[in-house]
Regions:
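Early extracytoplasmic/lumenal segment of secretory-pathway proteins
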Residues: 86-176
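A structural signal for short loop-to-beta-strand junctions that line the ligand-binding cleft
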Residues: 90-99, 153-156, 162-166, 190-222
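Extracellular/periplasmic juxtamembrane helices and adjacent flexible linkers that interface
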Residues: 98, 348, 356-420
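Ligand-binding pocket segment of bilobal, Venus flytrap-like solute-binding proteins
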Residues: 174, 260-329
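Short beta-strand->loop
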Residues: 185-195, 320-334, 344
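A bilobed periplasmic-binding-protein/Venus flytrap-type ligand-binding module shared by bacterial periplasmic
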Residues: 222-229, 335-348, 357, 365-366
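Short helix-loop capping/hinge motifs at secondary-structure junctions, enriched
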Residues: 228-236, 270-276, 345-351
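Short loop->beta-strand "edge-of-pocket" segments that line small-molecule binding or catalytic clefts
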Residues: 240-260, 268
Length: 420
């Protein structure tokens, strides 16, 4: 996650360059948004300002316009980022080769990673002090991807794969060439019997009938509406309305969030077939994708998208943004599950961790801190009765090769863009 190396004498800056835009710095280090807001850039609280001004103004330009000394500000920001990095070190993150009798690996949602890790570290230390076997963990930030886990899975050797795996999205766990081989042989088996009421209201049963996968929480995606760019068009209230010709070249898709994009693509395919994928390509705002900019038929290449599909978590940042508001689709927010898998043969040794990670305490961190609704029945997710979900369901998952389907849908999506 480190960028350019700049030596200004006092401190080595391996985090950012003064020539980086404010937006690129915040995107790389989300924790810096609060730092900027409290250090002279209050307007960045407004997400629209961050999206527009933040993408065009470099840190150096911004500091000069505020008559702030760039060297002093840079040093202050480096110190802030190094402190955050020290939290990572103290929580035993990025430790290289981790070993234990029980190994827990995977990724955690970025916004709640630190509070989750604090809880996990404390729990693991307590458990290791009283058990005759050791528990170890390596849980990275979701935006770093899963390549390091995938490499072990590709070996086909269950001994090389962690005893507990955590990840959002469908790509890793449902690719027949990856986790599929282990699932068919019954290596992993995890089940949750009781489920939060929020997922039953609309007859959504997140319990796997094959008892192989467990869902600990979900990432819900909703519509973010930009009033100015939307103009006199009526905002879409359902996924079907979003896919209509009226919103051609108007919708920002979560292209930089692979798990969410995969969930979107597979859900649209399940509901509307390949025709739905073609419609998705048509409404996708091409101007956000440099390679397609030339072909884009946008009203204005530089204008913000009228609609963005974003995680529900980000809607809590909308306070004060008069031009932006969110819509929870009437036919349900897109649901991207956060899965947990555990090895059957290690059932006795992994059960304490599963009990802990599926507990009300951890569920509350998912729900309250990150607006990632928890499946724990005791957690109050704070959702209204009409805030339902759209998800593909277990029948569809178990009756399709999801890995191949994702590849086909993605290819169809890109081909459809090329033909526009």
């Amino acid at each position: 996650n480190k960028n350019k190396l700049i030596d200004r004498g006092a401190k080595m800056n391996e985090f950012f360059s003064l020539n980086d835009t404010l937006y690129s710095i915040v995107e790389k280090y989300p924790e810096t948004l609060g730092f900027f807001v409290t250090n002279g850039f209050e307007q960045l609280k407004n997400n629209k300002m961050l999206e527009t001004m933040g993408k065009t103004i470099t840190l150096e330009m911004a500091l000069k316009s505020r008559k702030i000394n760039p060297e002093l500000f840079e040093e202050k920001l480096i110190t802030f980022l190094q402190k955050d990095e020290m939290v990572d070190i103290s929580l035993n993150i990025n430790r290289g080769d981790v070993k234990g009798d029980v190994l827990i690996e995977g990724v955690l949602p970025c916004p709640i990673r630190i509070p989750l890790l604090e809880g996990i570290k404390k729990w693991v230390e307590e458990e290791n002090s009283k058990r005759n076997y050791t528990i170890a963990y390596d849980l990275k930030s979701a935006n770093l991807g899963l390549d390091w886990v995938t490499e072990k899975i590709k070996t086909g050797d269950p001994e090389k794969v962690a005893d507990v795996l955590l990840s959002a999205g469908y790509e890793l766990f449902f690719d027949e060439n990856l986790m599929g081989q282990y699932m068919k042989n019954g290596i992993f088996e995890t089940y949750i019997e009781e489920m939060n009421k929020d997922f039953f209201i609309y007859k959504i049963d997140l319990r796997d009938p094959k008892r192989q996968y467990a869902i600990v929480g979900v990432v819900a995606a909703v519509f973010l509406i930009n009033k100015t760019t939307l103009g006199n068009r009526k905002a879409p209230e359902t996924w079907e309305e979003l896919l209509s010709d009226e919103f051609e070249d108007s919708v920002a898709l979560p292209m930089n969030d692979l798990d969410l994009f995969n969930a979107l693509v597979v859900t649209i395919y399940k509901e509307y077939g390949m025709e739905g994928i073609h419609k998705l390509a048509k409404v996708y705002k091409k101007s956000l994708h440099p390679a397609q900019m030339v072909k884009a038929k946008s009203r204005n290449k530089d204008e913000a998208p009228a609609i963005s599909i974003i995680p529900y978590f980000f809607t809590q940042m909308l306070t004060g943004a008069s031009d932006l508001y969110s819509i929870w689709p009437k036919d349900g927010a897109l649901l991207s599950p956060i899965f947990i898998l555990s090895k059957k043969e290690k059932e006795d040794k992994v059960k304490p961790f599963l009990d802990f990670f599926l507990s009300e305490n951890i569920g509350t961190i998912f729900s309250a801190n990150g607006k990632f609704p928890s499946t724990n029945p005791k957690v109050e997710n704070g959702l209204e009765p009409d805030q339902n979900f759209k998800w593909i369901g277990w029948d569809f998952i178990h009756n399709n090769d999801i890995g191949s389907l994702l590849k086909n849908c993605e290819k169809e999506f890109i081909d459809a863009i090329d033909k526009l």
